[in-house]
Amino acid sequence: MRKFAYCKVVLATSLIWVLLDMFLLLYFSECNKCDEKKERGLPAGDVLEPVQKPHEGPGEMGKPVVIPKEDQEKMKEMFKINQFNLMASEMIALNRSLPDVRLEGCKTKVYPDNLPTTSVVIVFHNEAWSTLLRTVHSVINRSPRHMLEEIVLVDDASERDFLKRPLESYVKKLKVPVHVIRMEQRSGLIRARLKGAAVSKGQVITFLDAHCECTVGWLEPLLARIKHDRKTVVCPIIDVISDDTFEYMAGSDMTYGGFNWKLNFRWYPVPQREMDRRKGDRTLPVRTPTMAGGLFSIDRDYFQEIGTYDAGMDIWGGENLEISFRIWQCGGTLEIVTCSHVGHVFRKATPYTFPGGTGQIINKNNRRLAEVWMDEFKNFFYIISPGVTKVDYGDISSRLGLRHKLQCRPFSWYLENIYPDSQIPRHYFSLGEIRNVETNQCLDNMARKENEKVGIFNCHGMGGNQVFSYTANKEIRTDDLCLDVSKLNGPVTMLKCHHLKGNQLWEYDPVKLTLQHVNSNQCLDKATDEDSQVPSIRDCSGSRSQQWLLRNVTLPEIF
């Protein structure tokens, strides 16, 4: 009997422990689920503290997100909403971990504590919840608190409900002041940024796009350069966040900003002269002729002094070159700080529509910057893009007055001292179409790329792909590509201009109208029956098919 009672006690005790274990297991399991939901960015509860070690989960440490096959169709539909993989973005934590992609020399740099404060201004229009809030969290989690004055979110007339009251409720719970400012009507990036800058309080204004992720140590190097010289405007290295997988890929510290003949921003290799100026130290900032425009920091007072943005420009486009020219020509400095890295989702297409169409807006903006800042070189641009001259570009008197007040240098100074490797040839004999006398067709780059054959097509008189420059170096040039022949009878290809003559040296005879390739001693000829879309090169015969009319343009003296 005693033994039976003892067994009952043991059994009851064991049962209690089993029940207690089950309770604890269920409790912590549910807690983990709560944490997981919170990390994935559901707008409830407080935000997580800065990530100290890599999490486990989709996209952690910047790794790509792979969507299962059964969800591919849904993924494609969701992609159309923002022109990036929204499904992948929503699977990633709002405070995901990222690799430290800085150069080793950057990781040991020490910055003073008394750097200026910054307001981070982020403009958004119908942005995805996950990308917008991931931008905000990355700023908060990876910025020294005493340097981050506030974050200003400027809503450019978004239509999505979750960007209204739910957004305001969410950001109120963050540990840094986050203000949501609303534009009354769709105004575009330029005017929305001006609104954000006007309400900001920091000593420095940092502009970011709404689909960025800041990495460790991103802010201090930017603020340190501005503290060193308040007239220095600084950009981080822009890393790539894949629009397909949200993989985080480090950008290169060996590229800087330039522009092509059509005034489109382009990345080009950092020239040797800039490497020499830095004595080979890649951790030092790169002086860049232009900036991409989406991500940069500027002293708030200096921003006002040099004229903020041109408020006469519409929506987006051209404002980055305009402010770049203005900074350099009016006594400032523009740098890429190689120890600062910020990721950006690069999309292949824009999900937005613009009143009047994108082309019309960009033409107007480019016309304004050309008229105010490019002096006689604006004529070069107008030959490339004659449609620009037909747009109404508004009143520029206040911008011309600003240039006079600031005693800014001419554009020729900018090309000679800041951007001597510009694609714009400063010395040339001819600019325009190159027309074959027999066929009445024109050379055409066909929007082809480096190492592809130059084309020939019916002359259309609209500039663009049919504009070639016969330069003072006797190159036949289209933007940064030159006509090149490496063997007898061709083909005639387009290669990067190397300025070493050789295979890119052409002699034009204004009497015979021939374009003779000096190395091969052959002449440019019309297309052959075998390939009707490319010119040929043959032994010089004096035939009409080897005669070419070059458009000689009378421009103001710029030689």
From Swiss-Prot:
The reaction(s) this protein catalyses: L-seryl-[protein] + UDP-N-acetyl-alpha-D-galactosamine = a 3-O-[N-acetyl-alpha-D-galactosaminyl]-L-seryl-[protein] + UDP + H(+); L-threonyl-[protein] + UDP-N-acetyl-alpha-D-galactosamine = a 3-O-[N-acetyl-alpha-D-galactosaminyl]-L-threonyl-[protein] + UDP + H(+)
Comment on protein domains: There are two conserved domains in the glycosyltransferase region: the N-terminal domain (domain A, also called GT1 motif), which is probably involved in manganese coordination and substrate binding and the C-terminal domain (domain B, also called Gal/GalNAc-T motif), which is probably involved in catalytic reaction and UDP-Gal binding. The ricin B-type lectin domain directs the glycopeptide specificity. It is required in the glycopeptide specificity of enzyme activity but not for activity with naked peptide substrates, suggesting that it triggers the catalytic domain to act on GalNAc-glycopeptide substrates.
Tissue expression summary: Colostrum contains a soluble form.
EC top class named in words: transferase
Cofactors, names only: Mn(2+)
Family (UniProt): Belongs to the glycosyltransferase 2 family. GalNAc-T subfamily.
Entry annotated with the keyword GTP-binding: no
Gene Ontology CC annotation, any one: extracellular region
Name by which UniProt lists this protein: Polypeptide N-acetylgalactosaminyltransferase 1
Gene: GALNT1
InterPro entries the UniProt entry points to: GalNAc-T, Glyco_trans_2-like, Nucleotide-diphossugar_trans, Ricin_B-like_lectins, Ricin_B_lectin
UniProt keyword annotations, A-Z: Disulfide bond, Glycoprotein, Glycosyltransferase, Golgi apparatus, Lectin, Manganese, Membrane, Metal-binding, Secreted, Signal-anchor, Transferase, Transmembrane, Transmembrane helix
